[in-house]
Amino acid sequence: MLSSLGNPRQAATQLLNFALILSTAFMMWKGLSVATDSPSPIVVVLSGSMEPAFQRGDLLFLWNRNIVQETDVGEIVVYNVKGKDIPIVHRIVRKFGAGPKAKLLTKGDNNAADDTELYAKDQDYLERKDIIGSVVAYIPFVGYVTIMLSEHPWMKTAMLGIMGLMVVLQRE
């Protein structure tokens, strides 16, 4: 089983194959980011605040190409709050004004109150520039893998270790 590591050329080939897989995944992610004009074109729903529309673990696909187009009330958007690095998936419930400077108020479908408490200090509303993207499609429950990996770090280490071993010990 470990005899394949004895040949330096074969070990180098397997290492390069592993690097190729990682770089291809990275290029696909960056390509999707450019195509959707979103820094995070795919997000996972982390809480139950959007039930019944979206469940925890749903994988959402975002589109941000319509940055000049008006954002409408009822649209489900993903936004980042200044100073926080966790994207929030909520629905626009009120809109004040028009154009890129319109003030937007969001709320989770399963929440009793709007999101003003979630916004950054001295921020009462969102603007279009705060929005990462609008939800255009989703796949139910697929994102549970990432939730499990973030809630149980040992699973991430084990999974990466197994994948690395499979690549290194693979015979052609």
Swiss-Prot record:
InterPro entries per UniProt: LexA/Signal_pep-like_sf, Pept_S26A_signal_pept_1_Ser-AS, Peptidase_S26, Peptidase_S26B
What is the uppermost EC class here? hydrolase
Q: Which UniProt keywords apply?
A: Endoplasmic reticulum, Hydrolase, Membrane, Protease, Signal-anchor, Transmembrane, Transmembrane helix
Question: Does this entry carry the keyword Transmembrane?
Answer: yes
Residue ranges of the region described as C-terminal short (CTS) helix? 158-169
The segments annotated as topological domain Lumenal are 36-172
The organism's place on the tree of life at top rank? Eukaryota
Q: Which Gene3D superfamilies match?
A: Umud Fragment, subunit A
- Recorded E.C. number(s)? 3.4.21.89
| Parts of the chain on the Cytoplasmic side | 1-14
For this protein, the parts annotated as crossing the membrane are 15-35
Name the catalysed reactions: Cleavage of hydrophobic, N-terminal signal or leader sequences from secreted and periplasmic proteins
Give the way it sits in the membrane: Single-pass type II membrane protein
A single Gene Ontology biological process assigned to it is: signal peptide processing
The reply on keyword RNA-binding is no
**Gene Ontology molecular-function annotations:** serine-type endopeptidase activity
Active site positions, chain numbering: S49, H90, D115
**GO CC annotations, alphabetized:** signal peptidase complex
Q: What does this protein do?
A: Catalytic component of the signal peptidase complex (SPC) which catalyzes the cleavage of N-terminal signal sequences from nascent proteins as they are translocated into the lumen of the endoplasmic reticulum. Specifically cleaves N-terminal signal peptides that contain a hydrophobic alpha-helix (h-region) shorter than 18-20 amino acids.
Instruction: State whether it acts alone or in a complex, and with which partners, per the record.
Output: Component of the signal peptidase complex (SPC) composed of a catalytic subunit SEC11 and three accessory subunits SPC1, SPC2 and SPC3. The complex induces a local thinning of the ER membrane which is used to measure the length of the signal peptide (SP) h-region of protein substrates. This ensures the selectivity of the complex towards h-regions shorter than 18-20 amino acids. SPC associates with the translocon complex.
- What's the record's remark on domains? The C-terminal short (CTS) helix is essential for catalytic activity. It may be accommodated as a transmembrane helix in the thinned membrane environment of the complex, similarly to the signal peptide in the complex substrates.
Family per UniProt? Belongs to the peptidase S26B family.
Please identify the protein, giving its name as recorded. Signal peptidase complex catalytic subunit SEC11
Give the originating organism. Pyricularia oryzae (strain 70-15 / ATCC MYA-4617 / FGSC 8958)
Question: Which lineage do the record's taxonomy fields give for this organism?
Answer: Eukaryota, Fungi, Dikarya, Ascomycota, Pezizomycotina
